[in-house]
């Protein structure tokens, strides 16, 4: 009996630890984040922990001066992608380089060499999303889907609709994710994108511009340009534009 009680206590301890390690579904306000000044960059830590699909995920922003790099080109066993907030960033994946501007995206599968240089004459800021999956890494699946890749904001067609419009970036598997889908929504002033709903996929909403309110479960939280919203699997949510101008935001889901 004492042995069973001990097992229950130990299990409860690790369950509590796991819960603490889970990334919280909420609005992460960019202006509230501490700025860590390093030799080559400024860094703002957004969140770090685990989720339903990922054993580890970490998000931060990096800001670098013109002509500077945050670090030397490198490779690692995690998967990673970036979204450029402002400035002009030269992104290199293996032997392929491209200068990307605000709203552009790049993903690096495990093992691929990648690096960044500020190619403009003003500061460049970008979001970094680094993660590893609970399931085994599938490099073959990633390579069949196209491997590491970049998406230039200027190449994405805007498709208007009655609530605003959409830019479809991609939907594909990666080495760590069976499904990764990304689009950008333009939501007209004063309206909801949709009614409160749930889905199995985890989701991040990244505000490019505007003033919104996101319902997360039973709470309502404001999110403005630059802020990030994390929505865990099957949590009730809905977003509304509470400003006087269109809001623009990334929405990306993974499973």
What is each residue range found by the language model?
Residues 95-110, 218-234:
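Short acidic-glycine-tyrosine-enriched beta hairpin
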Residues 77-79, 83-89, 200-213, 217:
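Glycine- and acidic-residue-biased ligand/ion/polar-headgroup-sensing regions
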Residues 59-107:
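Mid-chain, structured segments of secreted extracytoplasmic proteins
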Residues 18-57, 121, 125, 134-179:
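A short, N-terminal "cap"/entry segment at the start of jelly-roll beta-barrel domains
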Residues 43-45, 60-75, 168, 183-199:
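Conserved short histidine dyad/triad with adjacent acidic residue
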Residues 1-22:
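Bacterial Sec-dependent N-terminal signal peptides
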Residues 110-136, 233-255:
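Ligand-binding loop in jelly-roll beta-barrel domains
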């Amino acid at each position: 009996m004492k042995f069973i009680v001990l097992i229950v206590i130990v299990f409860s301890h690790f369950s509590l630890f796991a819960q603490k390690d889970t990334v919280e579904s909420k609005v992460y306000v960019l202006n509230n984040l501490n700025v860590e000044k390093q030799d080559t960059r400024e860094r703002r830590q957004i969140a770090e922990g685990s989720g339903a699909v990922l054993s580890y995920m970490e998000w931060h922003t990096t800001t670098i001066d013109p002509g500077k790099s945050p670090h030397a080109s490198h490779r690692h066993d995690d998967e990673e992608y970036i979204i450029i907030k402002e400035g002009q960033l030269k992104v290199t994946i293996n032997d392929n380089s491209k200068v990307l501007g605000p709203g552009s995206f790049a993903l690096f599968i495990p093992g691929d060499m990648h690096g960044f240089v500020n190619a403009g004459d003003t500061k460049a800021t970008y979001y970094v999303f680094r993660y590893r999956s609970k399931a085994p890494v599938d490099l073959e699946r990633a390579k069949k889907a196209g491997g590491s890749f970049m998406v230039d904001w200027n190449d994405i067609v805007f498709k208007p609709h009655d609530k605003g419009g959409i830019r479809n970036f991609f939907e594909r598997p990666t080495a760590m994710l069976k499904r990764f889908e990304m689009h950008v929504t333009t939501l007209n002033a004063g309206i909801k994108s949709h009614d409160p709903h749930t889905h199995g996929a985890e989701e991040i909403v990244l505000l490019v511009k505007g003033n919104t309110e996101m319902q997360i479960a039973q709470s309502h939280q404001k999110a403005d340009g630059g802020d990030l919203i994390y929505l865990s699997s099957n949590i009730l949510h809905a977003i509304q534009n509470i400003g006087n101008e269109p809001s623009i935001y990334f929405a990306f889901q993974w499973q």
